[in-house]
Amino acid sequence: MRRMLYAQLPSRALVVVAQLGIADILAEGPADISTLAERTSTDAVALARLLRGLAVFGVFEEGAEQVYSLTPLGEALTSGHPASALPSATLVAGQFGAAWGDLLETVRTGQSPFERSRGVSLFTHMEQDEELRAVFDDSQGRGLALELDEILRAIDFSAYPTVVDVGGSDGTFLRRILSAHPDISGIVFDLPGSTSLQAERPTADPLEGRYSVATGDFFDSLPEGGDLYLLSHILHDWDDDRAVQILRTCRAAMSDDATLMVVDLIAANRGQRDERLHTAALMDLYMLSLFGGNGGQERTAAQVEVLLSKAGFRITRVDSLPSGMNVIRAVRAA
């Protein structure tokens, strides 16, 4: 129990390491504590204790004479890592971490901290805070990079000639799908402020001509003509009514032959304690802290099925992956 109570300390230590840029310094090569303290303007004794603690958790290697180096785990805190946790650390250091600290009031009121302090939801707040939105999108994209290999091994996307990535942000998922399957094409769809793919498209893009970018609101309408409509970590951001509305918008754009694919964590049923469900449990607490008691959430398989049924879908297949991620496929119900 005490280990759980004190678990926030390694988290805070990682945030400090991220704020000081220590992983990027060590990416240049091993360094002793005096060098690290000088380059980060910190106290050498305090910094050594911080790094020593994280070395026990496998983030750093501590060598002779307090020389530190990165482990493969620690490399995930470097800015250049494809699945870098730096954007997530930035969120925890700022408004998201503050929301965690306000969890008691969230549980008492059911309201999110953003509703209480600003009178708007998190997503409405991010429309007004471009810097926060950019860090959030970056964090989402880097986190997705951790899942893509597993998903692409498990799912044959070649069966879907045109993929519509709904709420696809910078197109990370779609680009990986297209790279793995050269005979298909796709559309990235998101709010105008969220879709940075058009602006960031590489000058010599090997996927040129195989995808397009469409903007709009997935509560209103979506591009028609897709064979697969992909919702990756979208439904868990919304309450039940809004989630059903997103699904109905997908259904309206889909033909009878099209497939809906929902990629999300699945929460534990009553009494389940499978270790694979720990990630979903942590993420649901995360969602509670940000969205309040009646907002975004991780759902059980039965709850997801209810949402799909309300929106006019019938589940055809569920793939439960080793990481705890689930890929749910559905079609329009008769």
Swiss-Prot record:
First-level EC class: transferase
Reactions catalysed: 5-hydroxy-3-methyl-L-tyrosine + S-adenosyl-L-methionine = 5-hydroxy-3-methyl-O-methyl-L-tyrosine + S-adenosyl-L-homocysteine + H(+)
Regions annotated as coiled coil: none
Pfam families: Dimerisation (PF08100), Methyltransf_2 (PF00891)
Residues of the active site: H236
SUPFAM superfamilies: S-adenosyl-L-methionine-dependent methyltransferases, Winged helix' DNA-binding domain
Gene3D superfamilies the UniProt entry points to: 1.10.287.1350, Vaccinia Virus protein VP39, Winged helix-like DNA-binding domain superfamily/Winged helix DNA-binding domain
Involved pathway(s): Antibiotic biosynthesis
Keyword Acyltransferase: no
GO terms, molecular function: O-methyltransferase activity; protein dimerization activity
GO aspect biological process, one term: methylation
EC number(s) reported in the record: 2.1.1.-
Keywords on record: Antibiotic biosynthesis, Methyltransferase, S-adenosyl-L-methionine, Transferase
Family: Belongs to the class I-like SAM-binding methyltransferase superfamily. Cation-independent O-methyltransferase family. COMT subfamily.
Descriptive protein name: O-methyltransferase SfmM3
Organism, as annotated: Streptomyces lavendulae
Gene responsible for this protein: sfmM3
